[in-house]
Amino acid sequence: MTDRLIIQGGKKLSGTLQVDGAKNSAVALIPAAILAESEVVLEGLPDISDVYTLYDILEELGGSVRYDNKTAIIDPTDMLSMPLPSGNVKKLRASYYLMGAMLGRFKKAVIGLPGGCYLGPRPIDQHIKGFEALGAKVTNEQGAIYLRADELKGARIYLDVVSVGATINIMLAAVRAKGKTVIENAAKEPEIIDVATLLTNMGAIIKGAGTDTIRITGVDHLHGCHHTIIPDRIEAGTFMVLAAASGKGIRIENVIPTHLEGIIAKLTEMGVPMDIEEDSIFIGEVENIKKVDIKTYAYPGFPTDLQQPLTALLTRAEGSSVITDTIYPSRFKHIAELERMGGKFKLEGRSAVISGPAKLQGSKVTATDLRAGAALVIAGLLAEGRTEIHGVEHIERGYSKIIEKLSAIGADITRSSTAETNI
């Protein structure tokens, strides 16, 4: 069986969209709970498949997970360092955070190579470099990564590439190491601050999270705590783009505007009216979208995760817009699908040129990854007629209750299951 989203497009939407907790925080906060020696309570977690996969993995390790609505109570007391060869680990890329957490607590881990969205070469060499600097021996045996350490000792680690995953993973491994660790050229994303806040509440000593130099003084023990996750800035940004594309007045609630400066700046440049409050943003109706050029950069630059959704909106803009992805140059698989709907594009190296305005028509399309899926949903809402999106599972990895949320603001969107057919 294959599930599809069916969208009848061309409707103007209005109302309120509620942003959930940050996916990219959740997938690190849940493994971080392994480091504690008593119960950890996480509040505001998103209702997405990656989160449930991590609960299953923690239970495989002997932990207890109770969850209700958006709160998880994780008791890691009886956990053991069991090998995690594949299965659940293969379902999500962020399973690599289990390496840092298990290494930090047990001094050893065996983990199958992680899965998730395929976005071209994205190896974990910086993670491994960090673990080795802390004293771990890392080997790759039969498609699994083996980590072993007699003891972990603080070290000075310079990241050759600014990597959110490596920054968080090294933090997880270093908080219970002996002595001081310094991570230089660290990533500065809000999700890193969120993980550092959780670890600090557990008793870790961390200075400089959110800057390019993070200093950690190792401690022997970490205890449980309560922690509320930050809102998902990528979901918020996606909703802002969707509101600009198809809205006639949409309020987006549970946001931190300072986390959204890149997308706010670009939408303003495109002529999108906005009213920004402390924890909500109102997007007014837009008649004409102005063309823009965008380059993705590491935070606080324009996020690569929003370039695909924005591509769909730019089909409405007058003239030629250029999007350059400096982070993932091959992240343009959605372009071919948008072309099926009548979008006009030209790919040049790591850039896409979007010629507009184009009148999109409903079509059968396939989401190849999470944010491509978001782009196709926005395009489907913009398009005249019926759009059928395959690859729903990609979308649901990162957007919780997307059908319910969009239906509530007037979208005609449903889910349909059919037997496998090739399109």
UniProtKB/Swiss-Prot annotation:
GO terms for cellular component: cytoplasm. InterPro entries: Enolpyruvate_Tfrase_dom, Enolpyruvate_Tfrase_sf, MurA_subfamily, RNA3'P_cycl/enolpyr_Trfase_a/b, UDP_GlcNAc_COvinyl_MurA. Coiled coil: none annotated. The modification 2-(S-cysteinyl)pyruvic acid O-phosphothioketal is found at residue 117. GO terms for molecular function: UDP-N-acetylglucosamine 1-carboxyvinyltransferase activity. Gene3D superfamilies: Enolpyruvate transferase domain (3.65.10.10). This is UDP-N-acetylglucosamine 1-carboxyvinyltransferase 2. It comes from Listeria monocytogenes serovar 1/2a (strain ATCC BAA-679 / EGD-e).
